[in-house]
């Protein structure tokens, strides 16, 4: 049980600093918001979590304004639980990504599991039925025992929650780097489908309307979780287990079905709905009121509790999982109670909407908080941080590109070593623990460029992916940010989809350090540039700052989640070569792009040098490939990323045990170059003439570089290895390293 302090003790002890408030912020609350009154224990706690970076984006809000957020396809952009994009036929796709980084280091299983649960609630709070989960994971070197434990438990947590709730985990990515050793990244994306008429908002309006608490009971878990996620890790952070929530996927399944039933069958009495996520009850209710310009009066005696003698501070800040807030029209309370009772869930009226603009709490007959509602939400402070270019950036910009030399005799061995690099090696051992086909909508499961799910009742499908190569951002945040969006779009296009929009998780270091803030704001410039060029507005997202341990920051890692629309299921394309005799086409030119590459990291143990990126060529190449696919000319498609051409060819050959015979006018090293904007396609010989005509008309650089064979040998210039041996290395590397 938490012991309350008096307002005077709070001021004297400055305990608010431990909760994340600065002296200046505390004085602003006291002098400007409360007109000289000292905030009490509950009020101070509420401001501490609501003014955390995790809740109010006080350091990143000016950066987020750079993003393009509108477009004819966007029905709802940032500001609600998730973004909503039209896909025709009166249907929309709803998606968002969230981070659960700090909790997943302290308690990897529960941290990852509750990260999944939270983002799922964001989706069904919009009225959508969740149809897919994706994850983007970053870990330290896998030869470290602590890292292996975190990998094992994080993936088990994601699998455990998704598998139990019955939502397929269909895709994602995993990468390893020293910078994540003390600060892993666990970003989870959820995608849902909805009819336009069921789209909801998180709002509390209409004087006298009732505020309902529904779902699981409140405990003491996760108190100050939002504050915990808004500061650097230090020597004692691993012991902060009370800041980590505990999830129950079976409870969430009941809550999901109950909320969907309310929305679809009782939508006329529902005013608003929102997940109780970060900062729990105070965040959800104050945000709902602030968005509607309302006030709220809540009676905490009615809050369902699973622990005894909880005080208002604990009830308001608890981040217990599987809870939602509903605003219900006055006079219809019993309908809500009866519906949730059917699911054996609490549904309790805890207050009413007012028109006084205040957030007022009562407990045991006494007023325990009375503050302007906007001061908790819309009027939280915003900081314009100093940005300073790190010294390393000028060095990289001025330097020559990294150019390795690889002899004919060495190229095959280097290829084998690349196949076994943890970031490149198959993640099959991870994604096989996920149920990727529950709900029976999954057409393309993990292992291809994008996951693809059919849209029942239509001839359409959705392609979805997550992407980010943080090494590029370390060398050049602007180009790296642009590349992250472009690679996500390449994955969608290679699957036969038209990119629609993105969500993001902006994982960066401490924004109070000018060099770290520069990385954030510069990466946002690059993301915006690609989003505008590729017509993929930012419709939702999350910011996770202070990803530093003992002063050492992670690589800047803005994870991009993207969804695309495949208008006709016949255009669904996968990366694997289909049959011997098909021609292999390389779309895009290959240059000496090794800075930040897997090859550079493997050969010299570090990354350095200048990187290049031609966004105009990227767009032209993507448009061409999508046109070729929709014209029915392409048998398989795979984008080129880490490891370059050689890795892409191998991955395309693996699934069906085929070989390749490739002769291309590039150096041995360029087989592993990571020049952007490239694709590997396979086409049937009878489509060659039509394909090459389209290639010429599109002014795209592309050429037939070889053919698919049934020899079981991968032959690429001087590189030669059996497909079986390559598959064994590729699929065996990660399980061997995890032992």
UniProtKB/Swiss-Prot annotation:
Residue sites binding substrate per the record: 99-102, 121, 245, 319-321, 544
GO terms for MF: ATP binding; magnesium ion binding; phosphoribosylformylglycinamidine synthase activity
Entry keyword Magnesium: yes
Residue sites binding Mg(2+) 1 per the record: 98, 542
Family membership: Belongs to the FGAMS family.
Function of the molecule: Part of the phosphoribosylformylglycinamidine synthase complex involved in the purines biosynthetic pathway. Catalyzes the ATP-dependent conversion of formylglycinamide ribonucleotide (FGAR) and glutamine to yield formylglycinamidine ribonucleotide (FGAM) and glutamate. The FGAM synthase complex is composed of three subunits. PurQ produces an ammonia molecule by converting glutamine to glutamate. PurL transfers the ammonia molecule to FGAR to form FGAM in an ATP-dependent manner.
Annotated protein name in UniProt: Phosphoribosylformylglycinamidine synthase subunit PurL
The organism of origin for this protein: Lactococcus lactis subsp. lactis (strain IL1403) (Streptococcus lactis)
Species classification: Bacteria, Bacillati, Bacillota, Bacilli, Lactobacillales
């Amino acid at each position: 049980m938490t012991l309350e302090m008096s307002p005077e003790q709070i001021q004297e002890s400055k305990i608010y600093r431990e909760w994340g408030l600065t002296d200046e912020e505390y004085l602003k609350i006291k002098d400007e918001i409360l007109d000289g009154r000292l905030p009490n224990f509950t009020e101070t706690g509420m401001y501490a979590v609501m003014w955390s970076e995790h809740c109010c984006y006080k350091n990143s809000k000016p950066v987020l304004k750079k993003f393009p957020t509108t477009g004819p396809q966007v029905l709802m952009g940032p500001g609600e639980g998730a973004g909503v994009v039209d896909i025709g036929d009166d249907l929309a796709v709803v998606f968002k990504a969230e981070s659960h980084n700090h909790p997943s280091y302290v308690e990897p299983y529960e941290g990852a599991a509750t990260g999944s649960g939270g983002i799922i609630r964001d989706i069904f709070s919009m009225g959508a039925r969740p149809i897919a989960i994706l994850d983007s994971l970053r870990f330290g070197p896998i030869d470290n025992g602590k890292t292996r434990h975190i990998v094992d438990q994080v993936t088990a947590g994601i699998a455990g929650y998704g598998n139990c709730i019955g939502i397929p985990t269909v895709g994602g990515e995993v990468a390893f780097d020293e910078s994540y050793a003390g600060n892993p990244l666990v970003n989870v994306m959820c995608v849902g489908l909805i009819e336009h008429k069921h789209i909801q908002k998180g709002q509390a309006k209409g004087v006298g309307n009732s505020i309902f608490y529904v779902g699981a009971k409140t405990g003491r878990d996760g108190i100050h979780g939002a504050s915990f996620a808004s500061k650097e890790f230090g020597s004692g952070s691993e012991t902060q287990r009370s800041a980590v929530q505990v999830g129950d996927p079976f409870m969430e399944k009941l809550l999901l079905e109950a909320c969907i039933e309310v929305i679809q069958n009782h939508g006329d009495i529902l005013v608003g709905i929102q997940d109780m996520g970060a900062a729990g009850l105070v965040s959800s209710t104050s945000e709902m009121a602030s968005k509607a310009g309302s006030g709220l009066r809540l009676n905490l005696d009615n809050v369902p509790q699973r622990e005894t003698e909880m005080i208002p501070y604990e009830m308001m800040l608890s981040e217990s999982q599987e809870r939602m807030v509903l605003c219900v029209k006055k006079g219809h309370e019993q309908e809500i109670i009866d519906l949730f009772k059917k699911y054996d869930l609490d549904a309790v009226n805890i207050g009413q909407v007012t028109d006084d603009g205040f957030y007022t709490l009562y407990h045991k007959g006494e007023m325990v908080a009375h503050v302007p509602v906007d001061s908790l939400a819309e009027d939280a402070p915003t900081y314009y941080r100093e940005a300073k270019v790190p010294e390393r950036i000028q060095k990289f910009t001025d330097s020559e590109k990294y150019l390795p030399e690889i002899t004919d005799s060495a190229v095959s061995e280097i290829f084998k070593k690349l196949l076994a690099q943890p970031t490149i090696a198959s993640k099959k051992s991870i994604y096989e623990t996920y149920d990727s086909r529950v709900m029976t909508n999954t057409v393309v499961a993990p292992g291809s460029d994008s996951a693809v799910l059919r849209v029942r009742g239509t001839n359409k499908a959705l392609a979805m992916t997550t992407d980010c190569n943080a090494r590029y951002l370390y060398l050049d945040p602007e180009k790296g940010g642009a590349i992250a969006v472009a690679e996500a779009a390449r994955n969608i296009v290679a699957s036969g989809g038209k990119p629609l929009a993105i969500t993001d998780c902006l994982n960066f270091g401490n924004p109070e350090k000018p060099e770290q803030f520069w990385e954030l704001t510069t990466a946002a410039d690059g993301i915006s540039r690609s989003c505008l060029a590729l017509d993929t507005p930012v419709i939702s997202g999350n910011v996770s700052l202070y990803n530093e341990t003992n002063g050492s920051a992670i690589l800047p890692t803005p994870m991009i989640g993207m969804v695309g629309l495949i208008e006709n299921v016949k255009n669904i394309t996968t990366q694997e070569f289909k049959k011997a005799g098909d021609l292999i086409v390389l779309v895009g030119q290959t240059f000496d792009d090794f800075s930040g590459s897997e090859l550079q990291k493997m050969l010299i143990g570090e990354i350095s040098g200048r990187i290049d990126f031609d966004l105009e060529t990227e767009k032209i190449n993507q448009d061409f490939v999508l046109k070729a696919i929709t014209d029915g000319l392409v048998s398989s498609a795979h984008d080129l990323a880490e490891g370059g051409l050689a890795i892409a060819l191998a991955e395309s050959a693996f699934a069906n045990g085929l070989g390749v015979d490739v002769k291309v006018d590039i150096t041995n090293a360029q087989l592993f170059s990571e020049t952007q904007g490239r694709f590997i396609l396979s086409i049937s010989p009878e489509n060659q003439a039509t394909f090459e005509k389209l290639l010429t008309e599109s002014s795209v650089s592309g050429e037939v570089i070889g053919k698919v064979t049934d020899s079981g040998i991968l032959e690429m210039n001087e590189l030669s290895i059996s497909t079986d041996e390559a598959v064994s290395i590729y699929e065996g590397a990660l399980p061997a390293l995890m032992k």
